[in-house]
């Protein structure tokens, strides 16, 4: 698990390995599950119908689970079978990541991953059409703000803390906006533009700064 985590993101690997036992496995599970579906959404060789279908299949496979002990890995194997040669290891091993977390919190991670996969499928069906800032708010919540809410729940489960959830949403939106800025040229090359109409880098930078500023207490 740690090897794949390090290969996938050195940025997230370092803070995750410093977490105490139990929380470390939960956060690693959440990160790898989310990264697994993110790789589907951004896959350069799949068209949007294939992306949407795969994400919906993942969502349904996770919705059908009951516990870590009875987790049906075959459901995900079947979801990936038509595209397994095209998908990265972090995606095809999603079932392994799903059962990394302690059994008491793992279903919360499945629920979050399932919901996010469903939202990603919806946006893929729409061709990731972002017309207004309201569209951008909806997209950044669906694929990132909700991650902040999940992390709040993981901390709440482990420490009995209740972080401010509105800060978590802003933090996720801000990070996603930074990703959109960084990947803008690559996204355009594959026919996707996450910028609202009339926006350039200046407006997206301002959006990212505003969201990150509103979340300062969360990141502290």
Predicted regions and their residues:
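Acidic catalytic motifs of isoprenoid enzymes
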Residues: 1-220
């Amino acid at each position: 698990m740690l090897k794949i985590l390090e290969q996938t993101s050195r940025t997230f690997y370092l803070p995750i390995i410093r977490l105490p036992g139990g929380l470390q496995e939960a956060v690693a599970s959440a990160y790898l599950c989310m990264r697994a579906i993110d790789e589907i959404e951004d896959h350069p060789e799949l068209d949007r119908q294939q992306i949407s279908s795969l994400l919906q299949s993942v969502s349904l496979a996770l919705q059908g689970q009951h516990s870590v002990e009875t987790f049906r890995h075959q459901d995900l194997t079947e979801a990936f079978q038509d595209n397994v040669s095209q998908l990265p290891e972090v995606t095809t091993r999603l079932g392994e990541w799903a059962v990394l977390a302690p059994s008491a919190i793992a279903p919360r991670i499945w629920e979050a991953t399932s919901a996010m996969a469903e939202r990603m499928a919806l946006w893929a069906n729409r061709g990731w059409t972002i017309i207004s800032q309201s569209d951008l708010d909806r997209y950044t919540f669906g694929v990132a703000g909700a991650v902040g809410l999940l992390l709040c729940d993981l901390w709440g489960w482990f420490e009995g803390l209740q972080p401010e959830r509105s800060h978590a949403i802003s933090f996720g939106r801000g990070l996603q906006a930074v990703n959109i800025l960084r990947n803008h040229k690559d996204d355009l090359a594959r026919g996707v533009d996450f910028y609202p109409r009339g926006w350039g880098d200046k407006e997206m930078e301002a959006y990212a700064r505003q969201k990150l500023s509103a979340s300062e207490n969360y990141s502290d």
